[in-house]
């Protein structure tokens, strides 16, 4: 199902809580600043 693949591509990322860089899902530290505080990308809209 293409929709499922698109969701994985868009949301299977981690976001650095210091510099907001997008990182791979399996990352343990940020690729830009080296910070270890990563969160999964939000799947629900805010607001």
From Swiss-Prot:
Q: Which GO terms describe its biological process?
A: translation
Instruction: Give me the Gene Ontology terms describing cellular component.
Output: ribonucleoprotein complex; ribosome
Among InterPro entries, the record links this protein to: Ribosomal_eL40_arc, Ribosomal_eL40_dom, Ribosomal_eL40_sf, Ribosomal_zn-bd
Q: Name one Pfam family in it.
A: Ribosomal_L40e
Show the stretches that span the lipid bilayer. Answer: none
One molecular function GO term is: structural constituent of ribosome
Q: Does the keyword Mitochondrion apply?
A: no
- Signal peptide position in this chain? none
Is Ribonucleoprotein there in the keyword field?
yes
Query: What are the protein's UniProt keywords?
Result: Ribonucleoprotein, Ribosomal protein
Family membership: Belongs to the eukaryotic ribosomal protein eL40 family.
Q: Enumerate the PANTHER family for this protein.
A: 50S RIBOSOMAL PROTEIN L40E (PTHR39649), LARGE RIBOSOMAL SUBUNIT PROTEIN EL40 (PTHR39649:SF1)
Indicate what this protein is called per its UniProt record: Large ribosomal subunit protein eL40
Taxonomic source organism: Methanocaldococcus jannaschii (strain ATCC 43067 / DSM 2661 / JAL-1 / JCM 10045 / NBRC 100440)
Give me the gene this protein comes from.
rpl40e
